[in-house]
Amino acid sequence: VKKHLTVAAAAVATLSVAGPAVAANGPFAFEPIDGSAYTQQSATWAEPLVAPAGFTQQLVADETVLDIYGGDADDLTDMNVHNETGPDAGRYLIRTHEVGSNGAVSVVDLRTGEARVVAQDAGFKRLDGIEWTSWGTVLFAEETAGGRLFEGFFDPKNPFAPMEWVARPEVGILRHEGIGAMADGTVFVIDELNGGSIFKFVPTTRGDLSDGQLYALKVSGLSDAEQLWDASSYLAKSGAFEWVALDMDQVVLDANVAADAVSASEFGRPEDVEIIGQKVYVANTTEDRVVEIDLTKSVLNTFVHAGDNVPTENRSAGVTGFNSPDNLAKSGDGRLWIVEDNVPSDIWATQPDTDGDGQADRVELFASAVDPGAEISGIYFGTDPKTLYFNIQHPTKPLADGTWKITRR
């Protein structure tokens, strides 16, 4: 592979790969930090990240502002999205909370700082992914066996009123995490397990998720046995692919069973989904890989992979590297950002593929979490291209589970 790095080389190249020290120009340009926060772990932090100079970290809302579950129970603030269109676009931050039962969706007024729960149900389990649609609704879903995807009807004129919602089983009963909705109404989702597939829902009518067809991705040229998840051969799942239509009667019961019936490609814990133009990115956590699905060319590329175009982590040796990619975000200049499900949890920024090999030209370390028990989740660029929102989930520091933002000065 053209950008292959050995672990030994990674010890030298912890900041960035194949590029200058400063990560691009634009509204969120930065100088990569020296490495993961291995020696800076603290449960009494004032700021949650080791971050580059020139950036300001500010609390948006934690459990001192809104404590949904009380006592020692973490709110498990997970994913974030703005009300991206309509009246007061960008004023409100809508968040999921990934608790095992009685899950919740909360809203923060970014002007006043007020935060309230707008949707909660005893049957909500592990609410995770969230996405604003171009038709003005909010999608959120459960990351659990039998998980459902819901469509919520958020009213920015009455933002703290109980939000009406409806289940959309036609998009698939799955272990949902990432959700990506295109302007034409197409929705991309995943099944979050080793052996999970990647799915595309095409509605019969744009904006109506109650009727349509779910498809699963199938890489071309592989036998049915080779389509199965295998930790030793997952890199073979690249190249040309097709979308295979699934049995909708089975989809609304268990879309993973429907995908298995057509021998759809299986991946290692696909988690978040991010759409940038006509490319869909999926973080495959077990594979230490982010794949790029080129919708125009019908080609799947390995966009980021530990040991290829980003160093492999070796904490025992003090080597910063890429480990367990989880959530994804698109910055205002169209770059893909990645956060790890790891301790210390790191945030990485990519530079687009300009030489046509399907890989990110550079992958650079932006920040690292200092709390010894926390992971970063929910990275999200909203309407301000100089601001990145993120959550600190299940920290050691008391009442600190919640949302922050980091802004370039």
PLM region descriptions:
Residues 1-23:
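Secretory targeting and sorting signals
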Residues 23-409:
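Sequence/structural signature of beta-propeller domains
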